[in-house]
């Protein structure tokens, strides 16, 4: 039985305003995505579109469009950069599902369950190739540098997570380094390229990157909590997947650090040795409840969310700025 964490749900916790402001540009991004997934190798569009059309929020490409708008950009390079960001994200999901042996993604069977691990990995590689082609076509070496560096950092973060898997001695700082790489870096890059292609001052580029980095950390911390305290129907994946896969996330780090000897022995048995019995997930949630690790993880997410909002202070009041502030609130209050 999962514990439902009482998230704040303010009326401003919505991405609707952002969706409305970037709707016309997102139509162009989606058309670009559809075009660039085309291939004479029929399995490629089948696998790619299975995931791309499965109902994701498209938050990362919308952030690219939003930051370009906030920076007053008047060209069309942001369209291909936003599509590149979405392809990078989709590729990481295809690869992650293979590494994690995931059965579900966004409430549907994962691509690896339908086409196999090999196809998932190779189509992910195809999407990365298409992403880099579009970056080059935009003609901004700085934007290319930001996104290509992000691709390397994401891979480093994934390897760091792999190395930390099943290691209950992982510290909070070590875990935060993992999520900065594997999750927050793409948020940061997606936000930074907008003012870069608009040739805005370095201070604005840095501020936009800070918005993305802090939002990405907050987003992942909430995700970690939802794996133990969410609802499967909304999440589109099974509750407790992280636990069953031996993933060390912040709620686990805190529970292990605060636990007594017998509690630590439970975590070592379940996560390091993979010896999980019926009822162990409920016991894990019970320990997290005892030590308030889910609530404290959410508290940390709010800290990073506040820093994301603070980074927006550099920009004058506008509908786009307000919409971005609402996106931060949404990421903190979300249930999926």
What do these predicted ranges mean?
Residues 1-336:
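All-alpha prenyltransferase/terpene-synthase fold signal
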């Amino acid at each position: 039985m999962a514990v439902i964490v009482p998230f704040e749900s303010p009326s401003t916790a919505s991405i609707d305003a952002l969706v409305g402001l970037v709707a016309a540009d997102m139509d162009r991004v989606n058309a670009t995505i559809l075009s660039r997934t085309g291939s004479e190798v029929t399995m490629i569009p089948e696998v790619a579109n299975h995931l791309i059309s499965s109902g994701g929020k498209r938050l990362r490409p919308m952030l690219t469009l939003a930051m370009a708008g906030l920076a007053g950009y008047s060209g069309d390079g942001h369209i291909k950069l936003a599509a590149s960001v979405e392809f990078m994200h989709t590729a990481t999901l295809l690869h992650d599902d293979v590494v994690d042996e995931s059965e579900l993604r966004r409430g549907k069977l994962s691509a690896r369950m339908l086409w196999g691990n090999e196809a998932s990995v190779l189509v992910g590689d195809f999407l990365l190739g298409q992403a880099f082609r579009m970056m080059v076509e935009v003609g901004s070496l700085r934007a290319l540098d930001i996104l290509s560096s992000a691709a390397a950092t994401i891979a480093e973060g994934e390897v760091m997570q792999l190395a930390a898997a099943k290691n209950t001695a992982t510290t909070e700082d070590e875990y935060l380094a993992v999520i900065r790489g594997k999750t927050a870096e793409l948020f940061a890059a997606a936000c930074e390229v907008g003012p870069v292609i608009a040739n805005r001052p370095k201070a604005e580029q840095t501020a936009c990157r800070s918005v993305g980095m802090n939002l990405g950390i907050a987003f992942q911390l909430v995700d970690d909590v939802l794996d133990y305290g969410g609802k499967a129907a909304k999440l589109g994946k099974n509750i407790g997947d992280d636990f069953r896969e031996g993933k060390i996330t912040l709620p686990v780090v805190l529970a292990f650090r605060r636990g007594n000897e017998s509690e630590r022995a439970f975590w070592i048995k379940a996560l390091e040795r993979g010896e999980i019995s019926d009822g162990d997930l409920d016991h894990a949630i019970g320990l997290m409840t005892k030590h308030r690790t889910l609530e404290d993880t959410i508290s940390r997410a709010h800290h990073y969310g506040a820093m994301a909002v603070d980074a927006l202070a550099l920009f004058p009041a506008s509908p786009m700025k307000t919409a971005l502030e609402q996106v931060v609130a949404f990421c903190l209050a979300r249930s999926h």
